[in-house]
Design a protein with these regions (language model features):
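Active-site metal-binding motif and surrounding structural segment of the metallo-beta-lactamase
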Residues: 68-113
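Conserved beta-strand hairpin/beta-sheet module of binuclear metal-dependent hydrolase folds
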Residues: 14-75, 79, 172-187
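Short, structured coil segments at secondary-structure junctions
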Residues: 3, 106-107, 229
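Divalent metal-coordination and catalytic microenvironments
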Residues: 7, 42, 52, 87, ...
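Metallo-beta-lactamase
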Residues: 59, 71, 76-82, 86, 115-162, 168-246, ...
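Hydrophobic/aromatic beta-strand patches that form the interior of the parallel beta-sheet core
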Residues: 8, 91, 112, 146, ...
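Beta-strand-turn-beta hairpins that frame and shape the catalytic cleft
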Residues: 2-7, 43-48, 152-160, 177-182
Length: 248
């Protein structure tokens, strides 16, 4: 039986007017960018696995974002022939609200999270409390967590890579596909971060780190690691991926 996977982006909504330096630090001041919010279904030979669970647009609207809904979580999963009760595992890339706020909809699933990330979300630094609203902790405390530490192989086709910097326990998801290793970054980024314009490369940067970070140098090194390993990098908020049904 093949251990190759097919990755299905499930776009939930787009966010407009997002300050671009949050994605492309320290460049593009005064510019904004639109981004996608996704769940990722990893179609493979055995269990039903998704990466992240997204956030309902209503929660984003209360925080002042410009939001364009695409589909609900239920609608997106239904297109995959699934319901929330069919999901066996949720891989949590990191604990920011747009990646984990809908976790309570999956009562049967095991949530795979890095130990450093679980500790971070339970006791965030005051700087990050805006991204970890008080009720977020209440939403996730009843979840069934499977805690990992460091790089962890889930099966022959999926490996978790500890890629800290955006958050202390950010993890990227390396997926074996028919066209090589695809890596879902985990941290908040867009395609431009991995294909910076010539003037940025001339400044000596191989890529652009995220503007939201707990450790900037660590975030940069994690991004370099992913780019060097991956045959295909999947920037987790790249807007163009809303048009992709499958990867590769």
């Amino acid at each position: 039986m093949s251990s190759n996977y097919v990755i299905h982006p499930i776009p939930l909504e787009t966010i407009g007017g997002f300050a671009k330096p949050k994605m492309t630090y320290p460049f593009n001041w005064g510019q904004t960018v639109s981004m996608g919010v996704y769940v990722w279904y990893l179609e493979g030979p055995r269990e039903n696995i998704i990466v992240d669970v997204g956030i309902a647009p209503e929660r984003l609207l209360t925080r002042g974002y410009t939001v364009e809904p695409i589909q609900t979580l239920d609608e997106g999963l239904k297109k995959m022939g699934l319901g929330v009760g069919d999901i066996d595992f949720v891989i949590v890339t990191h604990s920011h609200h747009d990646h984990i706020a809908s976790a309570h909809q999956f009562p049967k699933a095991k949530f795979i999270i890095q130990r450093a990330e679980l500790e971070f979300v339970r006791d965030p630094h005051p700087i990050f409390k805006a991204i970890h609203p008080k009720d977020l902790l209440e939403l996730i405390e009843g979840l069934h967590f499977e805690v990992v530490e460091g790089d962890t192989k889930i099966d022959e086709g999926i490996e978790l890579l500890l890629t800290p910097g955006h958050t202390p326990g950010n993890q990227s998801v390396a997926v074996k596909t028919a066209q090589g290793t695809a890596i879902i970054t985990g941290w908040c980024c867009i395609q431009e971060d991995f294909d910076p314009p010539p003037e940025i490369r001339e400044a000596g940067l191989f890529l652009i780190p995220p503007g939201i970070h707990t450790d900037l140098m660590q975030a940069y090194e994690s991004a370099v690691r992913v780019k060097n390993i991956a045959d295909l990098v999947i920037p987790i908020h790249e807007l163009e991926l809303i048009h992709k049904a499958t990867i590769p």
